[in-house]
Amino acid sequence: MKDIADISATMTELGKRARAAAAQLAFASAEAKRAALIGAADAVWARRGEIIAANARDLEFGRDKGLSPAMMDRLMLDEARIQGIVDGLRTVADQDDPVGEVLAEWDMPSGIHIQRVRTPLGVIGVIYESRPNVTADAGALCLKSGNAVILRGGSESFHSSGAIHACLVAGLRAAGLPEDAIQLVPTRDRAAVSELLTMTDYVDVIVPRGGKGLVGLVQREARVPVFAHLEGIVHIYIDKAADPEKALRVVMNAKTRRTGICGAAECLLIHKDIADNLGADLVRALIEAGVEVRAEGLPGSLAATEADWGKEYLDMIIAAKVVDDVDAAIAHIRQYGSNHTDCVITEDDAVAARFFERLDSAILMHNASTQFADGGEFGMGAEIGIATGKMHARGPVGAAQLTSFKYLVRGNGTTRA
């Protein structure tokens, strides 16, 4: 009980500091926030040796825990990935400041003038798993949008996240912004997660970024509002009017470019009229690339079971199924999908339009790799996750999605009749 009490006190203190920092960030200048992010980017690159050394400790921890190759890939940092973190910080720094943006304005016959203006949410709690770059992405986006943030990274990335967090704090310090604007939970103890989820006095929204287990835990236990990021059970429907070369290129990229990200394809749905030719070619190409294909009605593959539909592999495995038409594909996706990202490959615009109209995934694609399901690829610089719910934020959650709004009403001694 003593440990739990200590964690409770620690989390309460983080919450108090975050709330105080949020009050200052709400009116921080765009220039100061940009300077903090540029300073953080410079610090990340200057300290890349320290970050890689910290990451080596996490990789050893991951090996000892028996993490899967996909999880180890998510965890690993090298100079190229650190350069990606630096680039992401600089991109967010150079974006327009969303705070204070006038979303709409109008005059009323009564004589009042009304503006709807973007405002920060306040304090955001971000809970994520093994990918340490989320520390930088989440910290940057929350700062850009004028929010304080409490980061709770996965136990696997504890040391990497700490090293990156130190760089973010260095940027805040250099820019004269409150260092408590970006805080990292200083323990691996899971009790800290439970505390964070119930801190209604200090936290305005929780953003979970991870697998089904994490998101389910957050949705069950949270008393704070949640932006849900469900797993990416990503489908690609190959229509009978698909261009074979486009289909092959898109499918191979969507599955094999990086298997451990939420935009990786996990299930192919192939029109029955092309199953014996293009379908067989796709299966053959995937197998030759080292992908295990679990299929129904396609030669050369392993037999699929019911458990393969609706499964996020995050690995060199893909499910495949022959379907009658686009409506059968839509029905399958509705039953087994996660409303994350789904794609149609076709040259028939009517089929593409039907796919877009009849599905309600956060991201729908036509003749493009599902690996574009990423805030950076959407021009957001970085993302805090892909929101699959229908309230407030949906799709890639960038800085603008981490704001609310308020109404500014101006008169001239105006009174209501």
UniProtKB/Swiss-Prot annotation:
Group of enzyme by EC: oxidoreductase
Keywords: Amino-acid biosynthesis, Cytoplasm, NADP, Oxidoreductase, Proline biosynthesis
Catalysis performed (reactions): L-glutamate 5-semialdehyde + phosphate + NADP(+) = L-glutamyl 5-phosphate + NADPH + H(+)
InterPro entries: Ald_DH/histidinol_DH (IPR016161), Ald_DH_C (IPR016163), Ald_DH_N (IPR016162), Aldehyde_DH_dom (IPR015590), G-glutamylP_reductase_CS (IPR020593), Glu-5-SA_DH (IPR012134), GPR_dom (IPR000965)
UniProt entry tagged with the keyword NADP: yes
GO biological process, one term: L-proline biosynthetic process
EC numbers, comma separated: 1.2.1.41
Principal location class: cytoplasm
Pathway annotation from the record: Amino-acid biosynthesis; L-proline biosynthesis; L-glutamate 5-semialdehyde from L-glutamate: step 2/2
GO cellular component: cytoplasm
Signal sequence residues: none
Molecular function per GO: glutamate-5-semialdehyde dehydrogenase activity; NADP binding
Domain of life: Bacteria
Compartments where located: Cytoplasm
HAMAP family according to UniProt: ProA (MF_00412)
Record NCBIfam families: PRK00197.1 (NF001221), proA (TIGR00407)
UniProt function note: Catalyzes the NADPH-dependent reduction of L-glutamate 5-phosphate into L-glutamate 5-semialdehyde and phosphate. The product spontaneously undergoes cyclization to form 1-pyrroline-5-carboxylate.
Family the entry assigns: Belongs to the gamma-glutamyl phosphate reductase family.
The protein's name in its UniProt record: Gamma-glutamyl phosphate reductase
